[in-house]
From Swiss-Prot:
Region Disordered: start-end pairs: 135-180
Keyword field: Cell cycle, Cell division, Centromere, Chromosome, Chromosome partition, Cytoplasm, Cytoskeleton, Mitosis, Nucleus
Described function: Component of the chromosomal passenger complex (CPC), a complex that acts as a key regulator of mitosis. The CPC complex has essential functions at the centromere in ensuring correct chromosome alignment and segregation and is required for chromatin-induced microtubule stabilization and spindle assembly. Contributes to CPC function by facilitating loading of the CPC onto chromosomes.
Keyword Cell inner membrane found: no
InterPro entries: Borealin_C, Borealin_N, Cell_div_borealin
Name of the protein described by the UniProt record: Borealin
Organism name: Xenopus tropicalis
């Protein structure tokens, strides 16, 4: 008998290789499809933006009459050309109206007023109106005109110069009243000399060495001298905080600001140096 052929396991191996290749191809295909779809979506968005911009440009090119027109009226007039013709006619009519308005001169109503006045004069006078007029005239005549105005007007008419004919004393209301000299006191004949060195000091200055300093409160009242030891700590906003030796332990630290803390630290270091010198 002829020898039988040996069975080989090549078929399943080939199938596994084919499946792997197919799977890798499908993965590549899916990735490329995703990339292409994303590009298409982006291009669609860009095209829509371009269409909107072109649409807006075309609308801007149209005249204002068509832009303000309702779309139903636009379609009823038969589209773009007929609507343009209608808008052009409206524009021409408006230009004619404005030109006629600008050319026509303004009419004055003076003649009408004169005619009305003449007609009123021809009418019979009303007794009530005559009584009212006489009353008003009497009231006006009762007022006495001021003398100052008359004198000024007469001087202006007589002489056109700026010089005054009558010299009057420039008396203020307070000076016009008669005040006794005893109330005002004695005025010296010669003016006293003032020491100019007083005005050379600035508004704020630091006290000199061994100079007696008198303290004042925020209300402006002077504070009495104290035998107890105290320290003035400068704080923010130009304020000074007085610290007594007996009240240092019970002081609320939250009330102090950063500048006060720094000044206290600086003072403590300087006091330590001073105490070392005393020893």
């Amino acid at each position: 008998m002829a020898p039988t052929k040996k069975k080989t396991s090549r078929k399943p191996k080939n199938r596994c290789v084919k499946n792997e290749k197919l799977a890798s191809f499908i993965k590549d295909f899916d990735s490329q499809v995703k990339i292409i779809t994303e590009e298409l979506k982006a291009s669609v968005v860009n095209i829509l933006k371009e269409v909107d911009s072109q649409y807006n440009i075309e609308i801007i090119k149209l005249p204002m009459a068509i832009r303000e027109m309702c779309w139903l009226d636009y379609i009823a007039k038969g589209g773009s050309q007929k609507a343009l013709e209608a808008a052009a006619t409206v524009k021409v009519d408006m230009e004619e109206i404005t030109s006629t308005v600008t050319k026509t001169p303004f009419k004055l109503d003076k003649k009408v007023k004169k005619g009305k006045c003449k007609s009123d004069e021809t009418l019979e006078p009303n007794p009530l109106q005559s009584v009212i007029r006489t009353k008003t005239k009497a009231k006006v005549a009762a007022k006495k005109p001021s003398t100052a105005r008359k004198t000024r007007a007469s001087t202006a008419n007589l002489t056109n110069t700026s010089k005054r004919t009558s010299k009057r004393g420039r008396a203020t209301p307070s000076a016009s009243k008669q005040i006794e000299t005893s109330l005002l006191g004695y005025t010296p004949a010669a003016t006293p000399r003032i020491d100019t060195s007083i005005f050379k000091t600035p508004a704020l200055r630091t006290p000199c060495l061994q100079e007696p300093v008198y303290t004042f409160s925020a209300n402006g009242s002077p504070l009495a001298g104290m035998d107890e030891l105290f320290i003035n700590v400068p704080a923010g906003d130009g304020k000074n905080i007085r610290l007594l030796a007996s009240e240092v332990d019970s002081l609320d630290i939250n009330r102090l600001d950063n500048q006060a803390f720094e000044n206290i630290k600086l003072l403590s270091s300087q006091l330590q140096r001073f105490c070392k010198k005393l020893k």
